[in-house]
Structure formats: C-alpha cells, structure tokens
C-alpha cells in the first residue's frame, strides 16, 4: 500500500538496526510516552530487534489509564443524580473505580452514553434541554482542541445544560517528573507523534536544557520507530542532547498554533492528577473565568472516598517502574474480559498490550 509499505521496508529496517547496534556502546534506557508507540513496538517485534544494551520502558502514554480513581468515582456519583446524562468515550466505560464502573452503573439504569467526539455532547444537550449533560473530558493535548471548540460553541449557543468533567492532561510536565525519578534513570525519550502535532517542539526544550537528555518526536510505523531510536542512540553516543523530529511528514516545530490558541482561549495550565503519580503542577488544565460555569466539579455531589485495588500495579506500570508480568494479577484474574485496573482496559494500556502481544 503506497505511503505505508515504504515505512515497513525490511532492507531499510536492517540498515537502521545495524546502525543502532554500532552506535550503542553502553546500557541505555529509552522511554516511549505514547500508547500507540507501545502497541507498534510490540506488534512489530521491535524490542527483539534491538541490541541487549537498549531497554525500552513504557511510560504514561494512555489517557484512560492515567485518569485517577477520584475522577472515575466523581463521574459515577454524577451518573447517580436525577436528570443527569453522562457522555463519555467508550474506553472509560469499563475502567474500574473504587467500587463500581460506568458500565456497571449503566446496567443499573443510569443514563450513560458512548460518544466518539466531544461535539456529540452538544447534540445530546440540545435534544434534552430538561437534563444536565456531563461530558467526561479526558485526553492529552491531541484531544484538547476539540474539547475547547465544543465549550466555545456551547457558550456561543448559550447552552445552560452542558458541563465538562475536566480530566485532561499535559504531557511535558509529567516528563519532568519521570526524569527526576531515581528509580528509572531515563537516557532519552521517544516523544509522542500525535501530541507533538499540536504542541510542536518548544514545550520539550526543558528536557535537554535542564536534564541534558535527548528526545526524538517519532512516528508510528516500524521504520519511524527504528529511526527514532537510532537518532537517540547517536545523540547519546555523541554526548549531545536536543529535541529532534523524526516524524517530519506530520510534525512541525511550531506545532499547530490555531489548535493551541483554541485550547488557551478556554483553559489555562493547572494542576493535574495522575494515577500512581499524584498531583503534578501545570500538568492539567483549569477553566478560564468565562467558562467556569461549565465545570462539572461545581456540582454538589457526595463522592465516596477513593481507593485502589491493593494488588494492582497499574500506577507503577505507568511510570515504567514495573512491567505487567511483575503484577500478581496479570493474566490470572486481570485480563481484557475482567480488567482489574485501567492499564488492562484501554487498547493503548501497557497491560493490555503485553497481554495481546507477549
């Protein structure tokens, strides 16, 4: 298939692998922070192609997975209110909260609807003016522009019954947290392609400047990933640190200024809460003043104290501290048909990927 086969050429792959082997002379730990990268790395067997000195870590690249139980529990509490409709992306349905899930609540008769776009929430609100519609706004910078546009349109149309439970995350601040970890020892990042189409290279510049580590924005085909790893290996071998773009056919240094303008018209950087990592400054978004009336956290609801499954290692898996096979629940009681933690729910979750491909 044109424009696909070119990025799966075996001869070129062999050349890149040889280049990586020649360049890598010491143990190196690289982390990918995109669930799509994790899936591609496993699907194409890229770990098995690399020299033993290179270890790939899977980081917090799954937006469903990093959403903490506190937000899941809040959404469940909202769903139990009278005349409330919850609108959510499909993956969120099966994510276990402290004692229930949205899927279980729907089975109990709560009005919970799966949508594919935040703009669909506007349609639901228009069709049900007598009810309060709450959209579960999760995702990284990739989905934030469309969420912002939905909010702008709702305000423009003076909708009073549409609200947003904001659990969006910003990627760059969590990278700083990971680099500060003494357990990980990250030598470089395979930076996310989709997120970078929005934010560009500038938000990553602290990585080489403050931590002297390289990062390469990388695509998702086998040759993309191998070339990204080779570019990182060269920087490490040459004792350099900069942010480079491998995925140049899609990503520009400036990102998408129009999309960023929409995001910051509605939101400002704020505290973000991550599963397993707690609160990270500026890793989330807060509503700007004109749009705070749409914040679903203004609802007066009683939420049960949140708790985690005592044996689930999802929080540590998201940080690259543990791998799924180290979890006692993995493949025993935790599997895609019965996920104990969110890392097994989403197709971008590390546990789901290990289960499917390893």
Model-predicted regions and their roles:
Residues 27-30, 162, 239-248, 274-275, ...:
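Flexible, glycine/charged-enriched surface loops at secondary-structure junctions
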Residues 85, 132-134, 188:
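Structural motif
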